[in-house]
């Protein structure tokens, strides 16, 4: 299993958000090639502006491991994380971030936004991630 496989898993989570009429962003967290946390946007469902895919996936991984730091873990997210989610990733000490599509408008990614040891890899399946987002917003308009 590789980055492409796990980003496809994150896209599957994003589809769940799309189906629930949420902004279609999904995330999975892995350790040792095993998914330990997953999430998709649930902002509208939970009436909670912090219920982003990354936050839900992080909480799931923390609960699974019984730990608050994830230096050996990788998060796969369909869209570049926002500033809030980058902050959560920073405090989790996540080992690696892999994202699908950049988000120039709302993305909060910068080298200082994440833990200095966090590896970053972007633009994996970017077109698939963008297509899902565009489909969602076309449906809304």
Where are these regions (language model features)?
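Zinc-dependent deaminase
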Residues: 1-19, 81-141
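Small-residue (primarily alanine) positions within well-ordered alpha-helices
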Residues: 10, 14-17, 27, 53, ...
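Short beta-strand scaffold segments in enzyme catalytic cores
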Residues: 25-33
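A cytosolic small-molecule/anion-sensing beta-strand core signal
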Residues: 31-32, 59, 71
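Short beta->alpha transition motifs characteristic of CBS
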Residues: 36-43, 119
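Glycine/small-residue-rich phosphate/adenosyl-binding loop
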Residues: 37, 54-63
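A short, polar/charged loop-to-alpha-helix boundary motif
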Residues: 45-55
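Immediate flanking context of iron-sulfur cluster ligation sites
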Residues: 67-80
């Amino acid at each position: 299993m590789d980055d492409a496989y796990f980003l496809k898993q994150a896209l599957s989570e994003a589809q769940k958000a799309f189906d629930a009429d949420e902004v279609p962003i999904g995330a999975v967290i892995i350790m040792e090639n095993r998914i330990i946390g997953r999430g998709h946007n649930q902002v509208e469902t939970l009436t909670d502006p912090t219920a982003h895919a990354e936050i839900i996936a992080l909480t799931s991984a923390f609960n699974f491991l019984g730990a608050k730091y994830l230096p050996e873990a990788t998060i796969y997210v369909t869209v570049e994380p926002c500033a809030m989610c980058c902050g959560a990733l920073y405090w989790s000490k996540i080992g690696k971030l892999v994202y699908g599509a950049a988000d120039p408008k709302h993305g909060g990614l910068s080298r200082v936004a994440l833990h200095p040891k966090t590896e970053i890899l972007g633009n994996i399946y970017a077109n698939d991630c963008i297509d899902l987002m565009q489909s969602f917003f076309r449906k809304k308009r």
